[in-house]
């Protein structure tokens, strides 16, 4: 949720760190800070600021020089946003500096013990506990000081530590919060996200939980928190720095909405097998015999990924005839769920680092379950923990609000459902039908986006609403849920989603002219049922915007979406509602790429 970036080498470090923080702004934050040193400098120099990275940059003095440093963007969990609570945190003797992502669960107990020993705390944060533990250690090496501190803390962390007496190194560690190393020419980088690294290096090493690393300018080594050396194999990142630029768009959200046709083309590329009307998904590590033995599918995700999973569950039931359902990972991991060896579990996450999803995967693995991962970021924690899976190949998604990753996740589920179906009873004819539908998607997405001006005008009207209702039935219901989430995320307009079949069971009491209803009305076997719901709303003077394949007489306005196969329609029907949310937020002057109180990757509980 926060962002870490660090560097050790020969270059002037402050501009590098500030640039790295700017590339991590999309993760969400409320304050920022930086600390630097060099072999020729006595001690550590630090600057912190509440607000944006530009506020921090304005406070950094011209003579703030160094060749080693760490920096951080903070998203408050312990203590309000302020200069004092911003990271890095420094020891009383100004020798130890720490940046930290995660939550120290036993921070309160440790703080009391340290205060009883005379330690004075300056901030309200849990991170400051780590600083004092490292500073008070009597170990000779910085690595051992950090190891001793980590031995007594409980919780999650991704940390980077500097010490004035060891200014030739940065020590980092990971447990439940991502840490990525970047390997350069006689220089090393560290970050919580590869977005901060790709402008400088494509060679990365991702630390595992329970792993530490020492970074020097011309070398690095990795080891467990117990001190055992580990082998680090660098991987090459395919994403380019240009992928993180806006490319002429006003916001990343707008850019990423318009990248969806190309993104869908990428997730399909090389996977379709026309000869057998199926798809190649070698990364599943699941052969035909094992696929036929699956008796149930359980999909776990959070937020938008959960909604993609809801759509995926319906696709799997329809095409593979396997009972399937989706559940928020944040709920699943806290109940004593029955783990069935004949159930295939699928974890969905854009970042591959979502804490609740990762924790659910780890618990399932502990109980012997087979788990697949559907993620966007190559080499992420879920990708490494899972038995197999699929990359959705959406490319970097910078806006906090997910658009193209959601779409590519739903396409990935369509591919998986087709694959499972063809190992069972799905006919060649139906396999071919779905493949033809998948191939139409990029062109149909482009067609939807060509109606942007029409949707923009509608959004300017809806910006006046205080609340909105979204409805859909069966395939349309997850689309309604995701559209509702998008609107509230970026516009801050209250929105709720209900199955259209549930209108009589409560939501009808809300219907009035001031409450717009957005209805998902696909031209499928439930068309007349959906039209009946529109009749009920209209009879109570409700205003209706329909998203449909043909004009709806009872709706005040209709956004026409091109028709695909029934099973694939949900992939398309949410895209105009992404634009609706975007332009509603724009009309209200919202910070679209960085909505208040939200973060891109939720890596804490």
What annotation goes with each model-predicted range?
Residues 165-166, 177, 204-248, 252-255, ...:
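A SIS-like phosphosugar-recognition module
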Residues 1-246, 250-251, 259, 265-296, ...:
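Conserved short alpha-helical segments that host acidic/polar catalytic motifs at enzyme active sites
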